[in-house]
Structures are given as structure tokens and as C-alpha cells.
Amino acid sequence: SGPGHFTPTLENERPLNIYGFSKLAFDHHVRRRIAEGSLPITVVGLRYFNVYGPREAHKGRMASVIHHFSKQIVDTGKVQLFEGSGGYGNGEQRRDFVFVRDLAQLNLYFAQAGPWAPKAGEKRQTWQAVVNAGSGRSRSFNEVARALMQVHGNARIEYIPFPSDLDARYQHFTEADLTGLRETGCDLPATSLEDGVRETFAQTEPMLV
């Protein structure tokens, strides 16, 4: 759970919870089928990082942390971040936040055959890939709070104790290695955190409750 550990290769695949394990189990199933030569279709696995965007209120507690922080600021005038943990200072734990529109465009890219669409007269080829789908840049929770304040106005940051029982299951750092994605020929631009937050809450602030 540190820098350099987010390349989708076997030595780096150590899920921290059952949800991650279930995703990895399916990837292994597909990889085995590929190795056996029994999967004659194009399969692309996109490993999403921390997705956020407009219209998340209906998701309740499963909404993104950016949505929850925004609601805290609107409702209470403050945002609660964890104190230092995992070698990171107060609020300095980092995540790769990816704007939902970027992922929609990425899915469409591959759904439309991406780099593998056959040219006129060519036979369609089949390809397989498991790649990261993120922005490629980690940002701290302090930076998230500051980006939200640009939209909602100043708020107080309150640092709360990090739960000791969470340490072994918590990702203190995530950043997508996009090498595999770039190798497919996909070079779609990533929306910055600041621009994504601004667009998200310009549309949805009345629906935060």
C-alpha cells in the first residue's frame, strides 16, 4: 500500500478485503482462460480507483469520500480528516481520485474497440488486458478539503484519531500506474481534482441532502 505498488501484476496483487479479493478472483479466472486459449474474445479489465462525480446523493454511505466531505462542509462548516497514519501526516494520506466522466469516456473507448478496431479489409483481432483506470496522480485529503473550500467557501479542518483496528486494512496511499493503459494506445486526458470538484458541485450542491 505504498508508492510503486499499483501496477496490475501478480506480485502486487494483495487485496485488503473480501471485495478486492472477489475482483481479483475473477481476473485470475479470465487470465487462466486466456492462457488456455479458451477465450477467443476481446476482454479488457478496468481497475477503477477512487471515482467521484455529480449526482451521488442516492448512494448514501457508499457515495465517494469527496461527496461526504462536501456534505460535512455544507452541513457543519467543517470537514473531518484522519490524523497522521502509515507514515503520512495529518490529512496527508493520499488517493488517486478519478472523475466519473473520464471513466465513462474510457469505457466508451474500449467498447468501440479502442486501439483494436480493424482497418478496412482486415480481420478483427482479439486482445486481452487488465489495466488501471485512474488519474495517475495521487492527491492528499488536505488537498481535497482545499478544493472543496474553493467551491463552498472556507471551512475548518478537524483532525480525528486514526482507528488502530483499521491500520492493516487501510490504504494510506493509492496512485494508478497507467503504463498498461498507455500501452493499449489510450491516452485520454485526466480531469484535475480541482476542475472535477468544481464541476461536480456546481451541478449537485442543491442535492447534497
Where are these regions (language model features)?
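Conserved Rossmann-fold NAD(P)-dependent oxidoreductase catalytic core, especially the SDR/UDP-sugar
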Residues: S1-I18
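NAD(P)-dependent short-chain dehydrogenase/reductase
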Residues: G4, I18, H28-Y109, A147-M149
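A short alpha-helix capping/helix-coil boundary motif
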Residues: P8-E11, L46-N50, R124-Q125, A155-Y159
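Active-site helix of classical SDR
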Residues: S22
